[in-house]
């Protein structure tokens, strides 16, 4: 459960990210593919090379979904319901992949905003990404 301090940390960090969210989403997705090659199996139709426009575009979709989740932190299940359905019923993404991407998102944010990436912010973002992952995998049961 996200505390009020966690919510403040997440919103503040996301505000600082601003217009870079899509760029960071693409970078985190590429980092996921490089670090965890099995994640590539869900994207056989993508050009997965460094700097791929398809990876960047999908990374922007990820970032947009997270931006929506930040705006609706008090109702993540409602905000992410359609995305949860898509990943559970149509795409059938292995739930572990959300954790892997979350890790790569944390690394990407830490690389771009080291001064703001305090232990408290790290913990809050980790809890937030975990909450998002939990919602996205809730329909698997």
UniProtKB/Swiss-Prot annotation:
GO terms of biological process kind: hydrogen peroxide catabolic process
Positions carrying Phosphoserine: 3, 35, 49, 102, 124, 138
Record keyword Transport present: yes
InterPro entries reported in the protein's UniProt record: Globin, Globin-like_sf, Globin/Proto, Hemoglobin_a-typ, Hemoglobin_oxygen_transport, Hemoglobin_pi
MF terms in GO: haptoglobin binding; heme binding; iron ion binding; organic acid binding; oxygen binding; oxygen carrier activity; peroxidase activity
Binding-site list for O2: 58
Residues the record lists as binding heme b: 87
Protein name as it appears in the record: Hemoglobin subunit alpha
Source organism (scientific name): Lutra lutra
Highest classification ranks of the organism: Eukaryota, Metazoa, Chordata, Craniata, Vertebrata
